[in-house]
Amino acid sequence: MNAPMKIVIGNAELWLGDCMDVLPTLPKVDAVITDPPYGIGIDRSMAKSSGAQSGGMAAPKGRYIASGWDDEPIGQEHIDLILASCKEAVIFGGNYFVLPPSKCWLVWDKKVNGHFADCELAWTNLDKPVRRIEWMWNGMLRKGGEERNGHPTQKPLGVMAWCIEQASNPKTILDPFMGSGT
């Protein structure tokens, strides 16, 4: 892989490179708020039922065909680097990883039914009770909303903004995995 490269966009820095190479070089941040790959994959049979084959792209009828990017969860070395890089952390899919005990989980109630999970859990090291947000979301499309991306695990902007609000007024926020299309 090429050496990491930094691009400045307004007051934000975008690093192009493997997070395992970049994270150790960055100063500690106030908060990591991230949605890393957690190895859930996508049910390829759902996409096949619509007759579509698109190699990791949105398929007809709102289905999605995986292309291998989420077949395996991130490793413990990723988790260790994330936790060492920040004061506070919000990690979606935290129930798929080995993380320290936490009294505060963020719960996103998607208000849906069907093939997708009713809720998503984000592990935190925040010192507060469990928090829940209701935000209707069904796969790649939010019913009645404007946000449409085609990313199979995209988080609504409002949900991610809410996660940031749960942290203790972070000045610097890091997402080492480029989020989930939000």
Predicted regions and their residues:
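SAM-dependent nucleic-acid methyltransferase catalytic core
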Residues: M1-I33
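Short, flexible coil/linker segments at or flanking structured domains
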Residues: N2-A3, I7, N11, M57, ...
